[in-house]
Amino acid sequence: MANLNFQQPPRSIANAALAGRTTGGFGGSSLAGHVTPTSGMFQTDFANSYPGTANYGQAPQQQQQQQQQPQLSPNRNAQLSVGGPAISSGNRNANLFGQRQFVERRAMQGLGSGPMSNMGNFMQTGRGGYGTGGGGGGPLNNFHVFGGGGGSDTSTPALLDPTEFPSLTNARGQNDQTLPQSNPLQPPGSKPYGNFFTSFGMVKQPTSEQSEFTMSNEDFPALPGTQNSDGTTNAVGSVAGTGGSGGASTENHLDGTEKPMNSIVVSGSASGSSGSNVGVVGGNGLGAVGSGIGGLAVGGGGGAGSSGGGGVGGNAASGVVGGSHVGLVGSNSGIGGVNSVPNSNAMMGVGGGLGSGSGSSGSGAGGEHLNDNSSNDKLVKSGVQTSPDGKVTNIPATMVNNQFGMVGLLTFIRAAETDPNLVTLSLGTDLTGLGLNLNSQESLHTTFAGPFVAQPCRAQDVEFNVPPEYLINFAIRDKLTAPVLKKLQEDLLFFLFYTNIGDMMQLMAAAELHSREWRYHVEEKIWITRIPGIDQYEKNGTKERGTFYYFDAQSWKRLSKVFQIDPEKLDKCPNISAFMNGQSV
């Protein structure tokens, strides 16, 4: 128990009901006002001051042993003076509670009508003056009163907070069935201190703890996917058609099962005798004919007993559809309703999303709902597919379909992922080091040169599956005359140089550029030339410093820049005749 700071010198008790209970040394000592079971009110020599109570409640040997024991905690002293037998020891002179100013004390109301008058009823009489009859007086006469009668004093707040003493209030009450009764005088099932301290205004009434936060569909009704208490899921969507209107949707899972989804928003205009089906399942019909069950499913469709598509002349639906693998949001009311998507706009959403799609008009009656998600599979399987048995499918028409291209590399990598024996043989290829544009929206297999090349294929190196009738280069290359490079412009010469690496044409283009005063810098890897009309260059020995033209192959432009040219870093003109004779160039 915390320090209550209720100590004051003894004063005369004006209440005759309490004064009549005093015996022995307590007879002339009437205590009025706030009287607490603190030891500061007693003198140091309790037995000498009150001789009639020297052996009160225990033998002298027990009293002497009690004086030799160390000071008990406040909770222990309170238990000995309230719930246990009456113990009067010399250690009561210890001041457990600090001095409190008189102005802070509350005025005491009548003791006769307050809980103090009934103190003996719950203290269980018969233990040395604790009850109303007999016992020769005891600590009850010196019991300080904490509050007014019956807890009617509501102007002053409670002295203790139950959160600081959970064992005194609700926490103690929760364990009453499991914990044994610490005081044999307490009735079975009673709370030892809860009612006592509460009635005296010492603690606040325990408040019920709030439960943990839970979100229901009423809190966020506009959010799709809110879980209901019955296990269904809310979906926001609408099904509208000229021939009728109805709302339904189902949520497809990866295992092929479907879960009903509550349709919240259903809108549409009905013409003729078409009714409206709103519920877990339903759909629009052909007038009064095509109304059926099945709900709005992935890929669309509609008709009696099917997936609930649009009516005659009507467009299909917009809604939330959670599809298998990848959700296809948007459907159509195609003829027969067999997941055909003519003139429909579709959105991709993993696990379903919010979107809309419009389809062509047609009759949805007699349609058939397909749960194989064939339209989804086409969208999901957009790349090369490999099966466990080694079969490779879905190869693009422009891709080389042998083991030397990207298909062979992809097949080997995927096989190494499943076969532990091939892990050590798999290629540690860095995709970023192959010169591929990984951010490209187009397919990369057209310029993929292989895992052993650090740059993509050139335009003339791209291999295409062309008919053999067009492969005539090997037959006519020796019959063609040599190109006249002197008639070509400089940009075409640069194209021949950069696109025919390691070929005879590259040497011929380099020789022609050299004859046109272009020089190839072996360190800068660029072609440079002097700017016409500028003859002022700073010469330092054999080096020249000035502004030169250079050809930028990335931007394919001729730009100017200041260079310090060392003639030893410039490549010489290749000797074409020596190369033709098999000599070094």
UniProtKB/Swiss-Prot annotation:
Gene3D superfamilies: CCR4-NOT complex subunit 2/3/5, C-terminal domain
Tissue: Expressed in heterogeneous levels between adjacent germline stem cells (at protein level).
Record bears the keyword Transcription: yes
Compositional bias segments (type: Polar residues): 42-56, 166-184, 372-388
GO biological process terms on file: female germ-line stem cell population maintenance; mRNA catabolic process; negative regulation of translation; nuclear-transcribed mRNA catabolic process, deadenylation-dependent decay; nuclear-transcribed mRNA poly(A) tail shortening; regulation of DNA-templated transcription; regulation of stem cell population maintenance; regulatory ncRNA-mediated gene silencing
GO cellular component, one term: nucleus
Biased composition (Gly residues): 349-367
Keyword Cytoplasm carried by entry: yes
Family, as annotated: Belongs to the CNOT2/3/5 family.
Protein's name according to its UniProt entry: Regulator of gene activity
Gene assigned in the entry: Rga
